[in-house]
Every structure is written in C-alpha cells, then in structure tokens.
UniProtKB/Swiss-Prot annotation:
Native source organism of the sequence: African swine fever virus (isolate Warthog/Namibia/Wart80/1980) (ASFV)
Single GO molecular function: DNA binding
Family listed: Belongs to the asfivirus structural protein p14.5 family.
Principal subcellular localisation of the protein: virion
One GO term (biological process): symbiont-mediated suppression of host cytoplasmic pattern recognition receptor signaling pathway via inhibition of IRF3 activity
Keywords: Acetylation, DNA-binding, Host-virus interaction, Inhibition of host innate immune response by virus, Inhibition of host IRF3 by virus, Inhibition of host RLR pathway by virus, Late protein, Viral immunoevasion, Viral release from host cell, Virion
GO terms under cellular component: virion component
Name of the featured protein: Structural protein p14.5
Subunit structure, interactors included: Interacts with the major capsid protein. Interacts with host IRF3; this interaction interferes with the recruitment of IRF3 to TBK1.
Length: 122
C-alpha cells in the first residue's frame, strides 16, 4: 500500500529556468495528489471532458479567423505600389549604348565627383 504521508518529489522549472524540487502531497478530501505550491486552489475548475462538437466549432472558428487574417494581410500587401515603380529602370535605360557602332562620337561620362575631377595633377 502506498504511503500517502511522504510527499512525492519532482523537479520543476520557474520562469528563469531555475530548477527546484517540488512535492506532491496527498489531499484527503479530494482523494487526488496536488502540488504543494497549489494550496488554495480548491475552487479550481478542471478542463471539461472532451466534447467533439465544441472542439470542432472552436477549430472551425480558429480556421475562419486565420483565413480572415490572411486575407487582410493580402489586402495590405496589395497596396498602391506606384512608389516602387521609380526603382525599376525604363526599357530605354536597359539598352546598351551602341554609339561607337553607329559612327557617332562616344559621349563623355560624367565624373562622379566633379569637384575632385577639376583638380588635375600636373
């Protein structure tokens, strides 16, 4: 026969991941084992037994909410993208310059730092 006077010890972790020893004590009134740190929770209502209709409706409600959120995110993503079109170069800008092949003089490229290019070394 089990000795209900000696508590059952177990390892528990707190929010800071520190491990300590907890103990289960026998509750003569409820005929169950409760953690010693749960004293005062006599009015605790346990989770009800599995009810397939409730869980199914909760699942369908959750699924509906997830679909709704996904639609909202899609709508937010499809906002006005005109501000980004300036980042895409025009087709004319993508064409290579064939000035030398056509016989035209090649254009001088602008220097990135005009002030620095004006100081020529002697």
């Amino acid at each position: 026969m089990a000795d209900f006077n000696s508590p059952i010890q177990y390892l528990k972790e707190d929010s800071r991941d520190r491990t300590s020893i907890g103990s289960l004590e026998y509750d003569e009134n409820a005929d169950t084992m409760i953690p010693s740190f749960a004293a005062g929770l006599e009015e605790f209502e346990p989770i009800p037994d599995f009810d397939p209709t409730t869980s199914t409706s909760l699942y369908s409600q959750l699924t509906h909410n997830m679909e709704k959120i996904a639609e909202e995110e899609d709508n937010n993503f499809l906002h006005d993208t005109r501000e980004f079109t300036s980042l895409v170069p025009d087709e004319a800008d993508n064409k290579p310059e064939d000035d030398e092949e056509s016989g035209a003089k090649p254009k001088k490229k602008k220097h990135l730092f005009p002030k620095l290019s004006s100081h020529k070394s002697k």
